[in-house]
């Protein structure tokens, strides 16, 4: 059973003006942006609203500094007017949107609009509309609320579709039964919100979600990859992935993917190893793909249209997994470990360190991550040539042999390297 809403939420369910919440929940720089935007909108006879997730999170008393402003009028022109003195701007005229970089914060401006979809999975066709139509195009009722920024209604909460009531009941509800057909990526968004906010997906919404899972086949690889990136930015992405696996959603990324207790434990360990940072997209993806075959990894790479560096992480992970048995032998020399792992992406090595079942293999992988990969001879190519090594491929060969000697503990100083090189040169005569 879900816990009852906090007193703070109950209070806000009764209060319909959030002016105080705005002041308490946003930094002064963003309040300044809202005030400047509202003033300019009033001068131009436009109505301006704060919408979406930030309104939801104000009611939940959760931090959210991503501001979305909707203008009943020309949002791009309004943003350009603000950008003239205090901000940088990026515009997208096709979608009637603009993004301001205001005092280091990102603020999105959108013309109130309605949307239609030519086919499932397509990007929407947009046309100017009312605030009500703009809110109706949102994914869930809890994200379909607005706060007026007009001087005569400042802070007034606008809730046409029952978002406050669903917040109170901790429910995620779509606005109409074709929502997932129009945009199947809302399935992934719903799972993220469900786990992040500890909400439940409303019964009809869950039935429609299950019904429309095949619609994910209409979504491009680029958009699916973006949804996975968003999952990995969650505090506990494994919860989202396990829920997606439970519902059959994860298989639409690739039929061989699985999210279970094994993955949950590895993701948690990845976060501990990555402190104070968060794990990279590549590391999380490498762990998710760790149990896939090489051929299955190729399918995942193609399906998600992964960039070349990230694709290499996935391929390196598959290659490493194939070598885990070799790395499980305690007697292999450090130089051999180096040769097996050198040139592979660090994210793949880290993933194998986390995922490998063999303690010996993990020890070899840890040794490479923390020590072996940094080892190199003191002597350089010029030193070798001055000592009699002929220019050409022999220089590289001797440098590699010196590195191996360092790795295996045969030498520990420049003088030792020089002595060993003279010995090798004497043998070559």
What kind of feature is each model-predicted range?
Residues 2-429:
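Catalytic cores of the polymerase beta-like nucleotidyltransferase superfamily
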């Amino acid at each position: 059973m879900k816990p009852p809403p906090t007193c703070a939420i109950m209070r806000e369910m009764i209060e319909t003006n959030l002016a105080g919440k705005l002041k308490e929940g946003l930094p002064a720089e963003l309040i300044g942006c809202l005030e400047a935007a509202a003033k300019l909108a009033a001068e131009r006879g436009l109505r301006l609203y704060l919408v979406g997730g930030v309104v939801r999170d104000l009611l939940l008393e959760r931090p959210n500094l991503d501001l979305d402003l909707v203008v009943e009028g020309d949002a791009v022109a309004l943003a350009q007017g603000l950008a003239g003195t205090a901000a940088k701007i990026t515009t997208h005229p096709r979608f009637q949107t603009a993004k301001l970089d205001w005092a280091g914060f990102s603020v999105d401006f959108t013309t109130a609009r309605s949307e239609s979809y030519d086919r499932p999975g397509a990007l929407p066709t947009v046309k100017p509309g009312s605030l009500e139509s703009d809110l109706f195009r949102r994914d869930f009722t809890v994200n379909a609320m607005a706060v007026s920024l007009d001087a005569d209604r400042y802070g007034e909460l606008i809730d046409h579709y029952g978002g406050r009531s669903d917040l109170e009941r901790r429910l995620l509800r779509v606005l109409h039964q074709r929502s997932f057909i129009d945009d199947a990526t809302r399935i992934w968004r719903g799972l993220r919100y469900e786990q992040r906010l500890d909400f439940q997906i409303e019964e009809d919404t869950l039935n429609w979600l299950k019904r429309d899972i095949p619609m994910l086949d209409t979504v491009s690889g680029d958009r699916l990859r973006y949804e996975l990136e968003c999952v990995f930015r969650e505090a506990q992405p494994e919860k989202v992935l396990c829920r997606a696996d439970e519902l059959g959603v994860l298989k639409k990324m690739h039929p061989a993917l699985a999210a279970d207790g094994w993955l949950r434990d590895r993701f948690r360990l990845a976060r501990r190893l990555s402190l104070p940072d968060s794990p990279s997209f590549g590391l999380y993806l490498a762990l998710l793909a760790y149990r896939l075959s090489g051929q299955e990894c190729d399918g995942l790479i193609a399906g998600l249209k992964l960039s070349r560096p990230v694709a290499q992480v996935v391929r390196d992970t598959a290659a490493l997994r194939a070598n885990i048995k070799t790395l499980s032998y305690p007697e292999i020399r450090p130089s051999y470990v180096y040769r097996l792992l050198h040139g592979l992406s660090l994210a793949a090595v880290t993933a194998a360190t986390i995922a490998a079942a063999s303690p010996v293999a993990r020890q070899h992988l840890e040794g490479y991550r923390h020590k072996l990969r940094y080892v190199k001879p003191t002597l350089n190519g010029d030193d070798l040539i001055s000592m009699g090594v002929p220019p050409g491929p022999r220089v590289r060969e001797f440098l590699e042999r010196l590195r191996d000697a360092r790795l295996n503990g045969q030498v520990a100083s420049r003088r030792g390297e020089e002595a060993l090189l003279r010995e090798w040169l004497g043998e070559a005569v």
